[in-house]
């Protein structure tokens, strides 16, 4: 079951991140927020995160950074070269699953 981004980070916090106060773009903001969240979840590759409460604060912060990049540069073409968000990757690095699988339950 996929985790809904708005269960992890509120819509109002996403709007604060991009300094947007109106309600006319809520659907678009939610779409980009979910895409940023999914990107960060795939990057970390931690199958132990099953519910919103499992997501560490650093990963939530990274989601906000990636979301802001996606929202600001939402056109397919850009006059400037875009790069991976190094700050977001540093925030997620310690939470990345390098084992390739979930930790087994103790006593199992």
UniProtKB/Swiss-Prot annotation:
Primary location group: virion
Top-rank lineage group of the source organism: Viruses
Keyword annotations from UniProtKB, A to Z: Viral genome ejection through host cell envelope, Viral long flexible tail ejection system, Viral penetration into host cytoplasm, Virion, Virus entry into host cell
InterPro entries assigned to the protein according to its UniProt record, in alphabetical order: Gp6_gp15-like, Phage_gp6-like_head-tail, Phage_HK97_gp6-like
Pfam families per the UniProt record, alphabetical: Phage_connect_1
Intracellular or extracellular location(s): Virion
First and last residue of the signal peptide: none
Function: Head completion protein that exhibits an open central channel for viral DNA ejection. Part of the head-tail connector by binding to the portal protein and to the head completion protein gp7.
Family named by the database record: Belongs to the Caudoviricetes gp6/gp15 head completion protein family.
Family annotation (NCBIfam families): put_DNA_pack
Self-association state and partner proteins as the record states: Homotridecamer. Interacts with the stopper protein gp7. Interacts with the portal protein; this interaction occurs at the end of the packaging when the terminase complex is replaced by the connector.
UniProt-recorded name of the protein: Head completion protein gp6
Species of the source: Enterobacteria phage HK97
